[in-house]
């Protein structure tokens, strides 16, 4: 069974960029799921609507980790559509997102905030090594 590709996107308040990425998703035949600040405590699997990932009930005492940049998660993208999306980012047709990931069995159990932290650390490590 083939699953429909999805883009999960946290805009960090960048509404124009969010609209452009949503438009790119539609152009590629992918669903677009906007992630809100309150979604950041949910698992990536739940946000991507993967079976077996229930909603995480957050107490008012639970610390919501701040996600301070936009984040894109690509789910169920076949290589051909992934190549098209990356090409549209390279040619400026779709806005670039520094922190992006592909949904995997490993990261679907993480909360969105945990995945953000991992992506941020990788991004900072990659670019600090280029100096």
Language-model segments: residues:
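Short, surface-exposed, charge-dense and proline/glycine-enriched linear segments
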Residues: 63-71, 116-117, 127-131
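N-terminal, charge-rich interaction modules
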Residues: 1-53
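Structured loop/turn residues at secondary-structure junctions
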Residues: 12-13, 77, 107
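Helix-rich interaction surfaces within compact, conserved domain-sized segments
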Residues: 17-20, 27-33, 82-129
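Intrinsic, low-complexity N-terminal interaction/targeting segments
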Residues: 36-65, 112, 116-119
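Mid-chain, well-packed structural core segment of small domains
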Residues: 61-92
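A general structural motif
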Residues: 4, 69, 96-97
């Amino acid at each position: 069974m083939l699953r429909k590709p999805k883009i999960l996107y946290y805009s960090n308040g960048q509404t124009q960029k969010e609209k452009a990425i949503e438009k790119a998703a539609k152009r590629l035949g992918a669903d677009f799921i906007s992630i809100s600040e309150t979604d950041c405590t949910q698992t990536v699997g739940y946000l991507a609507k993967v079976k077996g990932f229930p909603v995480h009930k957050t107490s008012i005492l639970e610390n919501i980790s701040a996600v301070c940049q936009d984040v894109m998660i690509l789910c169920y993208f076949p290589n051909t559509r992934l190549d098209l999306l990356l090409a549209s980012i390279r040619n400026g047709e779709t806005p670039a997102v520094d922190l992006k990931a592909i949904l995997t069995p490993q990261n679907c159990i993480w909360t969105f905030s945990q995945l953000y932290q991992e992506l941020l650390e990788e991004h900072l490590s990659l670019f600090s090594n280029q100096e």
